[in-house]
Amino acid sequence: MNIYRTHLCDQLRKEHINQEVTLSGWIYRKRDHGKIIFVDLRDHYGITQLVFNEADNQNFQLITHLRLESVITVKGIVVARDSSTINTAVSTGFIEVVVKHVIIEGEADPLPLNITSTQDYPEEIRLKYRFLDLRRDKVKNNIILRSKIISELRKSMEAMGFIEIQTPILTSSSPEGARDYLVPSRIHHGKFYALPQAPQLFKQILMVSGFDKYFQIAPCFRDEDARSDRSPGEFYQLDIEMSFVSQEDVFNVIEPVLLNVFSKFSNKTIDKEFPRISYHDAMLHYGSDKPDLRNPLIIQDVTEIFRDSQFNIFNSNIKQGMVVRAIPAPNTATNPRSFFDNKIEFAKTLGAQGLGYITFNDDFSAKGPIAKFLDEERLNRIKSICNLQPGDSVFFVSETEDKATELAGEVRTLLGKELNLIEKDTFRFCWIIDFPYFKYDKKEKSINFFHNPFSMPQGGLEALNNQNPLDILAYQYDIVCNGIEISSGAIRNHKLDIMYKAFSIAGYTKEMVDQKFNSLTRAFKFGAPPHGGIAPGIDRMVMLLADATNIREVICFPLNQSGEDLLMSAPSEIDKEHLKLLSLSITKKS
């Protein structure tokens, strides 16, 4: 028999009346009614109301002086509540326990934060006292939700014949794009392990090893700055790799997995379509490769409409190689001047020269600072391409292509929010496909990989030999949900001749590739199957399903914005003897 409890704090019902029970938990609330003190006892599962009577002086005095969140074990008799005190909001609301004996298991100091409060305490307090923060319902429920989601993901993968395999945590430095966390070797002086940014090479080698379908709930470590949707330090992903698959095969595997999880753990409407949007179209029409499809606004390129027009500012920009992008604003033609001025000021804060705009009256006649410079034919083309209606307005950005893309995307997002256009209680997924294989680094004045160097170029070796590298597309893909990238993946480059050629375009010799990726090139010499994979982010999925605004709300022990663990006081200094053992010394920053 368990000496601490006969029942959990959510289990007692009317049928337990007159039974003696033992309960353990935390003092959640106390209500002093003079000769009676009511205590809400909380454990992981629920709450039971305890009754302490003044007649039982010893127990009464003890509970009087105990602080909230102290841990106690009680023995008592289950009784029916008075009809006036029945609480249907809790499962045990028809009964209470009259306490006959109490043991203090752990006394609490004064609390730095109130467990019962929904107050938004400073992050410094919450993370330093995370063990208290995790007792709060909202945070606790997020962690429970995370556990259930991971369990469901495992079930889905196993049902499809995937094998869960753990890959090493100590490995070599990788080229994923972020900075590595390095671990010095005690035995091999001057050498370092790296914590994996992703199990990329290992999972590809597993395919070469003959495993057909692999997955794991993989920890990934990247020395990156924090964002609302990115936790510094570490994150977890559902890492997947499959042999003998095309891009479409990967899509067909992961779509039902995501739909199952999102439908099971949310009451929101889920659009079951996963539209395919090319990277080019995403940047053009949404101003982002992470488009939020709940926002119906579509950006259009109107450069040719303004070319050789009487509006000299845009016309001059176009002659210098700039572009013009249009962002519609439905039902805003009668908005006050301040509405338009605010958008112009917003664009300027982002580095824009400004914004142009045209408003269309109910008779579809055009007004605004630009309208008088455009003939009827050009105005009609704008109406048509932007799908405008009487009473609408349209904003214009004219900048270099990259800058115009960024600005138009920001204006689109702002308008979607201000005009209340973003769908509520909906999840909208999409695939972003056809990423560029290479990019031009203006700073280094060289060609480099756009994203994943291990992906297969569309067109294979022939494309690498004959096409402009900047025109080559990759078999790379992202899944985006409500403007948040939750997964990226690729069909891998499994042929050494294609790999060597691709890396040579990015400035790597064959010898450099063999040295940097020795394990992979060595494996590929012994029969590598076509393979591909994807890796949805667990943290971001939970964040979406929990309706959290910050990813740290769904991580049990997160680092703060500065990459510090306030609970464990990490990172910390290491004593000189330990440094000496690792052949390390600390140089002061100048």
Curated annotation (Swiss-Prot):
The keyword S-adenosyl-L-methionine does not apply. Aspartyl-tRNA synthetase with relaxed tRNA specificity since it is able to aspartylate not only its cognate tRNA(Asp) but also tRNA(Asn). Reaction proceeds in two steps: L-aspartate is first activated by ATP to form Asp-AMP and then transferred to the acceptor end of tRNA(Asp/Asn). The gene is aspS. InterPro entries: Aa-tRNA-synt_II, aa-tRNA-synth_II, aa-tRNA-synth_II/BPL/LPL, Asp-tRNA-ligase_1, Asp-tRNA-ligase_1_N, Asp/Asn-tRNA-synth_IIb, AspRS_core, GAD-like_sf. L-aspartate binds at residues 176, 222, 451, 492. Coiled coil: none annotated. The keyword Ligase applies. Belongs to the class-II aminoacyl-tRNA synthetase family. Type 1 subfamily. It holds the Pfam family tRNA_anti-codon. The record marks 33 as: Important for tRNA non-discrimination. Transmembrane segments: none annotated. Its EC number is 6.1.1.23. GO terms for cellular component: cytoplasm. ATP binds at residues 222-224, 485, 537-540. It is found in: Cytoplasm. Keywords: Aminoacyl-tRNA synthetase, ATP-binding, Cytoplasm, Ligase, Nucleotide-binding, Protein biosynthesis. One of its GO terms (biological process) is aspartyl-tRNA aminoacylation. This is Aspartate--tRNA(Asp/Asn) ligase. Homodimer.
